[in-house]
Amino acid sequence: MHQEYWILEVKVTPKSKQNTIVGFEGEVLKIRVTEVPEKGKANEAVIALLAKALSLPKRDITLIPGDTSRKKRILLPKSTESIVSHWREKGFYAGL
């Protein structure tokens, strides 16, 4: 069976005090991670945080290559789109 995907845009703040999903700023999900932006450490922390929040294995979350800035594009299974839309509608994320 073929899995469908969608793209989530995120803005990452590395070297934060805690790993957390802050909420939406327009269409962009703001995420804070404790890791430094070196050797992919912050990217891995973003993937781990989203995996936990969406109850997915990390292997189902893909960072689209080429993004070295704070703005990232994440490829997610289509089944997660309604969950993230709910976060956007509520104006916050209170799960973590």
From Swiss-Prot:
Q: Which domain of life is it from?
A: Bacteria
**Which GO cellular component terms, listed alphabetically, does the Swiss-Prot or TrEMBL entry include?**
cytoplasm
Protein family according to the UniProt entry: Belongs to the UPF0235 family.
This one is known as UPF0235 protein CAB243
Q: Which organism is it from?
A: Chlamydia abortus (strain DSM 27085 / S26/3)
